[in-house]
Amino acid sequence: MKKAIVIDGNSLIYRAFHATYKQAEWAVEKQLMPTNAIKLVASMIFKILNQEQFTYGLIAMDASKQTFRAQEYAAYKATRKPMDAKLIVQLPYLKKLFVAMGFRIISQPGIEADDFVGSFSNLMNKFDVDTTIYSSDRDMLQLINKNTKLKLLKTGTSVMQEINLTNFSLLNNGILPYQIIEYKGLVGDSSDNLIGVKGIGPKTAINLLLKYDNIENIYTNLEKIAPSVKNKLIEHKDMAFLSKKLAAIQTDLLFDEKLENFVLKPYNTQELDELFTSLKINNMQNYYK
């Protein structure tokens, strides 16, 4: 069976950058261009591609902070810090790296990388292609199905946890992938600055979802719910539904694309050589020659 790989580019890059931040500081002190993220991202992806054969591939990137979610809810991701200048200078080289590795890159203003990851996974699913998502973003849990699994980056970049349809419920307190957005609607998501229902924590949210399945059913059955919880649900109803809506990843952005548009190309060894030489990055050739 053919297989596909989709990488949440920003997630991987941020992880790599912060895991090796001292290297970036050292480079700046020596008046050199930081290359810490480039080196770690390159080695990580080379290892993945050299261990498993993929037919199709995509790296999804954020293009801008202003997205349709931010337009609908001004506080969306408002607490996130701007990208570090020591990482910004590495982005053009990272994109060159991805292309030389054979990937197609998708990035579009107004649309988050998550939505392209979801849309790519959905496209692959339609053609029964097994898909692996690489990300540190737990929002991706909602995309897991019989054809799609998530390699969740944990502990910097050194540990990856595989989450699939078989182990999903065990690892997520009994809920299923489609209930991830229901859960976020109730408890919110601090990383995205989604509020959810104030006063409802993970345990209460899980119990509600195990009993009522989704937010709509919870509100239909308010009279059966304990008054202390019911009152919170009533008070923050609008935010519950908004948080759920904003947490949902779009999956229909690539419906008119063809499979062949995402064929993973062989390594372009000449471009890789030139890139690493120009950046004075050594010991990479063993990965691709």
From Swiss-Prot:
Residue ranges annotated for the 5'-3' exonuclease domain, each copy included: 176-269
Biological-process GO terms, alphabetical: DNA replication, Okazaki fragment processing
Keyword Nuclease: yes
Short name of any one Pfam family annotated for the protein: 5_3_exonuc
Gene Ontology MF annotations: 5'-3' exonuclease activity; 5'-flap endonuclease activity; DNA binding
Enzyme class label: hydrolase
SMART domains: 53EXOc, HhH2
E.C. designation(s): 3.1.11.-
InterPro entries according to UniProt: 5-3_exonucl_a-hlix_arch_N, 5-3_exonuclease, 5-3_exonuclease_C_sf, DNA_polI_H3TH, FEN, HhH2, PIN-like_dom_sf
Keywords: DNA-binding, Exonuclease, Hydrolase, Nuclease
Database matches in SUPFAM superfamilies: 5' to 3' exonuclease, C-terminal subdomain, PIN domain-like
Protein task: 5'-3' exonuclease acting preferentially on double-stranded DNA.
PANTHER family: 5'-3' EXONUCLEASE FAMILY PROTEIN, FLAP ENDONUCLEASE XNI
Full protein name: 5'-3' exonuclease
Species of provenance: Ureaplasma parvum serovar 3 (strain ATCC 700970)
Taxonomic placement: Bacteria, Bacillati, Mycoplasmatota, Mycoplasmoidales, Mycoplasmoidaceae
